[in-house]
Swiss-Prot record:
Location of this chain's protein in the cell: Cell membrane
Catalytic EC class: translocase
InterPro entries: Cyt_c_oxidase_su4_actinobac
GO-annotated biological processes: electron transport chain
Subunit composition and interactions: Associates with subunits I, II and III to form cytochrome c oxidase.
Membrane-spanning segments: 7-27, 40-60, 83-103, 105-125
Keywords: Cell membrane, Membrane, Translocase, Transmembrane, Transmembrane helix
Main location: membrane
Source species of the chain: Corynebacterium efficiens (strain DSM 44549 / YS-314 / AJ 12310 / JCM 11189 / NBRC 100395)
Name of the protein this chain belongs to: Cytochrome c oxidase polypeptide 4
Signal sequence bounds: none
Role, per record: Part of cytochrome c oxidase, its function is unknown.
Length: 143
C-alpha cells in the first residue's frame, strides 16, 4: 500500500470516529445539557464524507497497484523526477484577469438573479475564454 491510499484510509478512520462521536453527542446532549434529537445535517455530512474518503482510498489503492513506483514512494527520488514537462505560460497576458472578472460578473448575476447580468457575464466569459485560447493567433490555412 502506498502513501496516498494510506492517507485516505487514515482520514476515513478519523471521519468515522468523528461521525460516531458527533451522532452520540448531538443525540443526547443539548447546549443546556438537556436531551435533544439527532442533528441530521452534520451527521449526514460526516457519514457521506467518510464514505467518500473510503471510496477514494479504495480507488487510489487499486490504481496504485497497477502502476510503477511513483516518485513520492521512491526514497531516492529527486524533485525533478516528478516535475515532468511544463507547458507554455504567458506571464504578460491580460486574459486570465479578464476571465476572472467575467466569472465575477456571472457570479453576481446568479447571486442577485438578474438575468441580464447573467447573460452579460456568460457572454463576457465566452469572449475571454476564446481570446485566451487564441491570443497568439490562429494558424493560417495551408491552401
Amino acid at each position: 500500500m502506498k502513501s496516498s491510499s494510506k492517507i485516505m484510509y487514515g482520514l476515513t478512520v478519523f471521519l468515522a470516529a468523528m461521525a460516531v462521536i458527533y451522532i452520540f453527542g448531538t443525540m443526547y446532549v443539548d447546549d443546556r445539557g438537556s436531551v435533544m434529537g439527532l442533528e441530521w445535517v452534520g451527521a449526514t455530512a460526516l457519514v457521506l464524507s467518510t464514505a467518500l474518503t473510503l471510496m477514494l482510498g479504495v480507488y487510489i489503492h487499486i490504481t496504485e497497484r497497477r502502476t510503477d513506483v511513483l516518485p513520492e514512494d521512491w526514497e531516492e527520488a529527486e524533485v525533478a523526477d516528478k516535475a515532468g514537462t511544463l507547458g507554455f505560460f504567458s506571464p504578460g497576458s491580460i486574459w486570465p484577469a479578464a476571465m476572472s472578472g467575467a466569472v465575477g460578473l456571472l457570479g453576481f448575476g446568479i447571486i442577485f438573479m438578474h438575468y441580464w447580468l447573467i447573460l452579460v457575464g456568460a457572454l463576457a466569459l465566452t469572449y475571454t475564454i476564446a481570446k485566451l485560447n487564441f491570443q497568439y493567433g490562429v494558424p493560417r490555412e495551408k491552401h
